[in-house]
């Protein structure tokens, strides 16, 4: 049998062999069992005659076993640095299992004590064949604990290889290692949990060897790998769409804080100390000091990292540039829209210089990078923001105005909206949009063509842009119908003003306010249909005075 064992041993195993306790060895030191690691790992083994030999007195030599008898040594102990192949390890393990099952003395006693769950692992670390059967682990529990564990039917007492039950080992045959082809989630989870329970004594021997032979990540056997987190950088969060979850102007405006239709808070109302009559429409603007805390935090965070973004934006990909543009524009609009909600420029949560620097960088991204867009698309984006903000201004005035008679009169309502816009919003927006004015002048080749609908040689400007948006979003919806009358828009508008004077008490002050409004809007150069309507309205209001 010994000859047979030596013949079947792998060529790379060196002096490693499995010792059969029933064969007497001649002039040989206790054989070292097949080693797997240089680490000292405790092993809990049960021998059939352990109870008998534990009762006998032990010699001093038995009380202090030498490390050479324990059976732990490096897999490179022979100095050849040759690793054992997986096939040779499995073959030797299978041979040891067959030899162990062939001896009735060991097999019968082990099966009686362990209720049929004994595997070849129980005799892996045995003593020599002279009958001096020693206990091979100096780190194991007491005799009583081992006996109780054996009799309790626990399936963990013989798991010195993978921590699984002997039934699982017998079903898996000689497959010691769980590879991608034969791994089982349940068995590997059991192995991991068992190995963890004995972590205070040492790591599993075969698990360590498997990690060396088959490198793997510990969590691969449990489930899918989690996405590796992006290495943080000062500005990396601005390159991902999840940051801030920027929204389009329509979305963030109608979901932001402010006195809207359903807010139950009056933003624009008459001053209680002033007589509320239609001819005296002095407004008392109620301040709403609360800024959205999230928007303010995002703005300050962006301003803090703005120098790094400016220094590194040329190395960003096209996708990263698009995401960065969206985040910057979303944060900028969420702050500037407050100017249409009864805020002044000095009440914004950042200095006007910082807000302008942020907009300058945004203009650079949209005009001079790989993610640049056409001038018409860029202007349409700006106009969309201004137009939607003007709708907010109109809604706040119309639905929060105290005098319903004044609001229900179209001429007076337009006059109130114009006053608030031209006396307050217009100049504040000129300040925060100043970087656009600089870009219109410095980069005229980019902005010149296609600004107005008709062919034009006029370069765009911020004041024209604001007035144009006010014309299209506020004025034309009220008075566009006068263009289709038989007598012409100017004549029809004049008759309409006279009727409003008689029915709704339109005063000279109201007409002068409209004269200022239409006169300033008429300064927009061009010959578009919308501009022709403004010219007709201006002529009609002049004739009515």
From Swiss-Prot:
Ranges of biased composition (kind: Polar residues): 11-24, 106-130, 151-166
InterPro entries the UniProt entry points to: Bit61/PRR5 (IPR013745)
GO cellular component terms attached to this protein's record: TORC2 complex
Cystine bridges: none
GO biological process entries: TORC2 signaling
Highest taxon, organism lineage: Eukaryota
Region (Disordered): 1-24, 78-166
Assembly mode: Interacts with the target of rapamycin complex 2 (TORC2) subunit TSC11 and the TORC2 effectors SLM1 and SLM2.
PANTHER family: TARGET OF RAPAMYCIN COMPLEX 2 SUBUNIT BIT61-RELATED (PTHR32428:SF2)
Protein name: Probable target of rapamycin complex 2 subunit BIT2
Natural source organism: Saccharomyces cerevisiae (strain ATCC 204508 / S288c) (Baker's yeast)
């Amino acid at each position: 049998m010994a000859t047979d064992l030596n013949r079947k041993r792998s060529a790379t195993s060196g002096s490693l062999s499995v010792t059969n306790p029933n064969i007497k060895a001649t002039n040989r030191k206790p054989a070292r069992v097949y080693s797997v690691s240089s680490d000292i790992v405790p092993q809990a083994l049960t021998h059939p005659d352990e109870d008998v030999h534990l009762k006998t007195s032990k010699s001093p030599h038995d009380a202090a076993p030498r490390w050479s008898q324990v059976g732990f040594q490096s897999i490179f102990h022979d100095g050849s640095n040759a690793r054992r192949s997986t096939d040779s390890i499995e073959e030797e393990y299978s041979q040891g299992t067959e030899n162990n099952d062939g001896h009735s003395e060991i097999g019968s006693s082990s099966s009686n004590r362990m209720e049929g769950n004994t595997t070849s692992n129980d005799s892996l670390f045995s003593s020599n064949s002279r009958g001096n059967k020693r206990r091979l682990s100096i780190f194991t529990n007491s005799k009583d604990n081992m006996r109780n564990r054996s009799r309790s039917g626990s399936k963990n007492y013989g798991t010195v290889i993978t921590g699984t039950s002997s039934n699982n080992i017998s079903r898996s045959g000689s497959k010691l290692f769980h590879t991608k082809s034969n791994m089982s989630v349940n068995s590997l989870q059991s192995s991991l949990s068992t190995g963890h329970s004995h972590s205070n004594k040492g790591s599993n021997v075969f698990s360590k060897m498997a990690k060396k032979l088959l490198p793997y990540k510990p969590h691969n056997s449990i489930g899918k790998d989690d996405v590796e987190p992006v290495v943080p950088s000062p500005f990396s969060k601005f390159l991902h769409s999840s940051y801030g979850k920027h929204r389009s102007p329509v979305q963030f405006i109608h979901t932001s804080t402010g006195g809207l239709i359903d807010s139950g808070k009056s933003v624009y109302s008459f001053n209680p100390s002033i007589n509320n009559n239609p001819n005296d429409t002095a407004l008392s603007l109620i301040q709403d000091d609360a800024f959205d805390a999230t928007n303010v935090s995002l703005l300050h965070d962006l301003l803090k990292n703005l120098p790094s973004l400016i220094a590194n934006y040329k190395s960003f990909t096209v996708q990263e540039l698009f995401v960065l543009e969206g985040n910057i524009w979303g944060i900028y609009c969420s702050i500037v829209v407050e100017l249409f909600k009864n805020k002044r420029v000095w009440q914004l949560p950042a200095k006007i210089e910082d807000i302008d620097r942020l907009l300058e960088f945004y203009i650079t991204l949209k005009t001079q990078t790989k993610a640049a867009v056409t001038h018409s698309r860029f202007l349409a984006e700006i106009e969309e923001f201004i137009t939607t903000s003007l709708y907010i201004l109109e809604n706040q005035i119309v639905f929060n105005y105290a005098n319903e008679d004044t609001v229900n009169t179209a001429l007076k309502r337009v006059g109130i909206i114009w006053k608030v816009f031209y006396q307050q919003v217009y100049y504040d927006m000129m300040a925060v949009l100043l970087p656009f004015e600089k870009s219109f002048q410095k980069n005229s080749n980019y902005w010149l063509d296609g600004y107005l609908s008709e062919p034009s040689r006029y370069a765009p400007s911020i004041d024209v842009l604001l007035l144009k948006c006010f014309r299209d979003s506020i004025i034309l919806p009220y008075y566009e119908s006068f263009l289709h009358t038989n007598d012409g828009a100017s004549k029809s508008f004049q008759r309409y003003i006279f009727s409003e004077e008689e029915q709704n008490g339109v005063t000279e002050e109201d007409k002068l306010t409209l004269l200022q409004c239409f006169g300033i809007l008429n300064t927009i150069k061009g010959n578009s249909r919308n501009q022709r309507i403004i010219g007709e309205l201006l002529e009609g209001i002049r004739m009515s005075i």
